[in-house]
Amino acid sequence: MSRVAKRPVKVPSGVEVKLDGQDVKVKGPKGELAWTVHDWVAVEQADGELRVQAQLDDRRAVALAGTTRALLNNMVTGVSQGFERKLELRGVGYRAQVQGKNLNLTLGFSHPVDYPVPEGITIEAPSQTEIVVKGADKQQVGEVAAQIRAFRPPEPYKGKGVRYADERVVLKEAKKK
């Protein structure tokens, strides 16, 4: 058995988990998430915990059991506490502001960049150079943050661009004559 899958997923109070065959639905204060578990993995619910077990005695099934446990844990954490990713804008004139369901970015292009906020995600701009992406689905939060960063990734000479708040950009030295 996978070392990750051995540990059960604790379901906190206020979070409701429904198992229907291979379909798992997790509902909590921050939202609702659904996912279909692979056929090689069995999920059991007992005593406020979710237990994951591989159906086959195969390396891939054991690996899938560990992955399933991690994804279920992310679902439970997401609907109870939520996930967030912080981005910061570095550069002269680089700005961000939220208008309704759109994120408006000024990133030094000849045109402003409008990013429509997907369903299940909330985007805040506490200041003009900060963006906070929040949501219940960890994968979707990371994907949206990566899409925003991709508009203008940090360049290696001055570090201008959109970067994650915890990202370290290693700067190159300019060419010398």
UniProtKB/Swiss-Prot annotation:
GO terms for biological process: cytoplasmic translation. It comes from the Bacteria. The keyword Membrane does not apply. GO terms for molecular function: rRNA binding; structural constituent of ribosome. Signal peptide: none annotated. Pfam families: Ribosomal_L6. The keyword Lipid metabolism does not apply. InterPro entries: Ribosomal_uL6-like, Ribosomal_uL6-like_a/b-dom_sf, Ribosomal_uL6_a/b-dom, Ribosomal_uL6_bac-type, Ribosomal_uL6_CS. Keywords: Ribonucleoprotein, Ribosomal protein, RNA-binding, rRNA-binding. GO terms for cellular component: cytosolic large ribosomal subunit. HAMAP family: Ribosomal_uL6_B. This protein binds to the 23S rRNA, and is important in its secondary structure. It is located near the subunit interface in the base of the L7/L12 stalk, and near the tRNA binding site of the peptidyltransferase center. Belongs to the universal ribosomal protein uL6 family. Part of the 50S ribosomal subunit. This is Large ribosomal subunit protein uL6.
